[in-house]
Swiss-Prot record:
The lineage of its organism: Bacteria, Bacillati, Mycoplasmatota, Mycoplasmoidales, Metamycoplasmataceae. One of its GO terms (cellular component) is cytosolic large ribosomal subunit. The gene is rplS. InterPro entries: Ribosomal_bL19, Ribosomal_bL19_CS, Ribosomal_bL19_sf, Translation_prot_SH3-like_sf. This is Large ribosomal subunit protein bL19. GO terms for biological process: translation. One of its GO terms (molecular function) is structural constituent of ribosome. Gene3D superfamilies: 2.30.30.790. It holds the Pfam family Ribosomal_L19. Keywords: Ribonucleoprotein, Ribosomal protein. This protein is located at the 30S-50S ribosomal subunit interface and may play a role in the structure and function of the aminoacyl-tRNA binding site. Belongs to the bacterial ribosomal protein bL19 family.
Length: 117
């Protein structure tokens, strides 16, 4: 159990501008990339295969997977990171599990998920 003072400090730090999304959703994560004196936005689009629960507070994170040139790429993002400028939910899929690690072993049509109605 967390200290009340720690909870109070965390409440001020948690970002409220990001949309609500779940495991199984297709998302676009807009990242701020700094290169020397320039700053640009890079978009990482893929399927959310894992997400920590809201009980984690500031340390909440999520994992996004995409296929790039036939190779699976996964990135782990801290949800409250200042590097993330925006998150767009593209499609909500119907899933029955909290962690979709089994998708790593699937390819092609077997890796598809049904869209929520």
């Amino acid at each position: 159990m967390k200290n009340k003072l720690l909870q109070l400090v965390e409440q001020n730090q948690i970002r409220k501008d990001l949309p609500n999304f779940n495991t199984g959703d297709n998302v676009k994560v807009h990242l701020r990339i700094k290169e020397e004196n320039k700053e640009r936005i890079q978009i990482f689009e893929g399927l959310v295969i894992a997400k920590d629960g809201p009980g984690k507070g500031l340390s909440q994170s999520f994992k996004v997977r995409k296929i790039s040139s036939g190779i699976g790429v996964e990135k782990d993002f801290p949800l409250n990171s200042p590097i993330i400028s925006a998150i767009e939910v593209i499609r909500r899929n119907k899933v029955r599990r909290k962690k979709l690690y089994y998708i790593r072993n699937k390819s092609g049509k077997s890796a598809r998920l049904k869209e929520k109605k």
